[in-house]
Amino acid sequence: KNLDYKKEPDHQKWCEAVELLASQRTMGEKTSEKYSRIFYYNEPDDASNLDSERYASNSLFDIYYPVELDAQTSYPVIVSVHGGGWFYGDKELYSYYCCHLASKGFAVVNFNYRLAPQNKYPAAIEDVAYLIRYIHENAGVLHLDMEKFYMLGDSAGAQLTANYCIIAGNAAYRSKLDFFTYDRLPKAVCLNCGAYEMDKREDNISDWYMKKEDGSYAVSEEQRKLFLSQLEYLTKDFPPAYLMYSVNDDLRFQTIYLDERMEKLGIRHVIRSFGEEHPDSGHVFHINLKNPEGIQCNEEECAWFHQYE
């Protein structure tokens, strides 16, 4: 059915987060120039190395470089996977956040992926894989040092980031999937306010992402499990991870589940909680560049990446 997501209680927190992101646009172009130089990259004329059916017209990305752009230098690269409940959001909403990260010495890739409900699972995770393959194959012209490749995501973007890494790090399981995957693992990741065990939620928020209009599932049971219970597929090959949640966020327990699973497998990681003394630090608070805790979190995450250079 057609839903007005802003009126659906289950999606209210997503909408509040999205409105917070949209407010960043008011910061203006001067702020953007202060943080970094923007390189806008569109789909090239010669797209012979792309699957034109998969690389849709909205599959565009921006790269944000440090202000001191040196054409002879390749930069450590962060791929940022935006949130929005798998149904909302785009790269424009994350532009100032990505500029901020670029100011810390990274080239930051900010991209669109196909959204639900028009595009069912695994469309979004396919697009993550296509994007990473593309920047890897074109790293030279894009001034990206893929030996220093990192990923981060928030909310649904954290789920997609974890999902990508689980698939990329498990060749045996990857061979069983019937959608596009890629095997390039980042050296480290940051997962912010994510959802990782959807089968532990009491609502059916994932149905509109997984089901077709007739009520049947769009993918096989095995592939549904990869989305709904992805921590079952986690292995020790998962990259070092910085995990973050807010105590004021209903999704906080999802990060605790992930922490417990990583601890059991011996995956190198840290977990950080925020918001104990700041009730305004809620879901994806770190995107708000006016929030001191958000700035602190972003500083810690950039330091987490830099230690793996």
Regions found by a protein language model. Give the residues of each.
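Alpha/beta-hydrolase superfamily serine-hydrolase fold, recognizing
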Residues: 1-309
